[in-house]
Structures are given as structure tokens and as C-alpha cells.
Amino acid sequence: MGTIVDITVTKENAERFWIVIHRDNESALKLTVDQDVLLKFRLKKGMIIDDALLRDIVYADGIKKAYQQALYFLAHRMRSEQEIVEHLRKKGVVDPVIEEVLEKLRAERYVDDEAFAAAYVRTQKNTSTKGPRLIQAELERLGVPASVIEQSLVEYSFNEQVIAARSLYEKAKKQRRAESARAFLERVKQQLMRKGFSHEVIAIVLADGSGHTEEEEREALHVQAEKIRRRYAHHPRPLYEQKMRQALYRKGFSLALIDEWLRRQDDDG
């Protein structure tokens, strides 16, 4: 039991107030509360404060502070509910207070996992090279419910996925190494899978893509063969050819082109 003996504005924040409570046989209690809490409980000098009322005041102020922290966190970008929960927990806010804050944020439309997920998909679709499966995994890490994620991915149409995957294919083609068409297509396939595109989308893109010309395949084989031949040059001719065929075939070149290269080597030699 105690009595409020002083109420003053804090120097740091004009919306927070120092409350000094005189308690019998105990040292005075000094705490700060938000102006909304001050008004809610109609706090004033001379007011009697029992332990139950004090707990209610402290709890209400904890909600107000956590709410302000959540708003500041939301000021940078939209957030999922789970992001807000994790942020407030790191700030030391207890779960009952967090739930109170979330209820208020939902009511005021500051948080909405459906709107958040839909906006997230649109943003990633328009600003990144991610496929839907990668975006889905990111939304799962952000704590968005599976049913909400499924609905949000409608924002990323199948045709848009094909266009995005084809763009990655064309970029990879421009940066193509000296490799066989088979090795190139496998490398691009793995890249598109890591980016989160489905097998169906990848199959369409690779089928539509124009692979190596025959001359490009010969040039790539020549580059790889020149690297490998030094490794086997000391072998007798039959073993040398066997080793070269095996090594170049593993790199995706056809036996016909490999044998053609070996014949040219014989002619040059």
C-alpha cells in the first residue's frame, strides 16, 4: 500500500512520467509510465495505490512500451507476426504481453500475415531471381502459416516463373564456360533448382533454350582435351586414347566428337 506523492514529466520523453509512491515502512517507489497509462488509471497526487493496482499499472505500461517497440520495428518494412514475436522476446518482453500487443496490432491492421506474404511474394518476384520454392522456404522461416504461404504464391504465376527461369538461363549462356552442352545444361538445371524453380519449369526452359552449336561443342571439347591430354600423354597410344575417351565422355562430350578430335590429332601428328 502506498500513496502517490509526485508526478513529473521525464526529461527524455515528454510522453512519459515519473511516478513517486510513498510506502509505509518502506523506501519510496519511483517508476515511469506512459501518458496513456497515466490517463487510463487516472493517476494523481494523493492517490492510494495498493499492490494489485500497482501490478496492473506496471503490466499496462509494459504493454504500451512493447507496442511502441513493435511499431518502431514495423517502421522499416512489413513484418510477419512471428518476426514481431521474436523481436519482442529479444527485448525481454514476456509472451502474455506480446499476445496483447499482437491483438492490438491486428486490430489496427499493422500486422496481417496474408497481406505480408502476398507483398513479400510480389517483391521477390519483381526484384530478385528467386523461384517460388525458395520464396516459400523464406516465408516458412519468417513463421508464416503454410496455408497463407500457399495462397500468397498465387501472386507468382507459372508463366512468370518460366520467364524468370529463362532469364537466368540466358544469363548463364552468356557466361558459358568451355564445357559440353550436356555439362552446361546440367549446371544450369542445378542452378535453377537451387533458385527454387520446379522441375516442370526447368524442363520447359531447357527444352526451349538453344544449346551449343556443333562448332561450339567442338571448341569446348578442344579446350578440355588440351587440359586432359597432358595427364595421359606418357601412356602408349591405345591406353592414351582409352583414357581420353573416358575423361571427355565423363565431361559430357559425345563419342563421335571425341573420336573426331583423336583422328585430327593423328592427322596433325
From Swiss-Prot:
Short name of any one Pfam family annotated for the protein: RecX_HTH2
Source taxon at top rank: Bacteria
InterPro entries documented for this protein: RecX_HTH_1st, RecX_HTH_2nd, RecX_HTH_3rd, Regulatory_RecX, WH-like_DNA-bd_sf
Keyword Cytoplasm attributed: yes
A GO term from the CC aspect: cytoplasm
UniProt subcellular location: Cytoplasm
Keywords noted in UniProt: Cytoplasm
Gene Ontology BP, a term: regulation of DNA repair
Family of this protein: Belongs to the RecX family.
Function of the protein: Modulates RecA activity.
Protein name: Regulatory protein RecX
Lineage: Bacteria, Bacillati, Bacillota, Bacilli, Bacillales
Gene (name only): recX
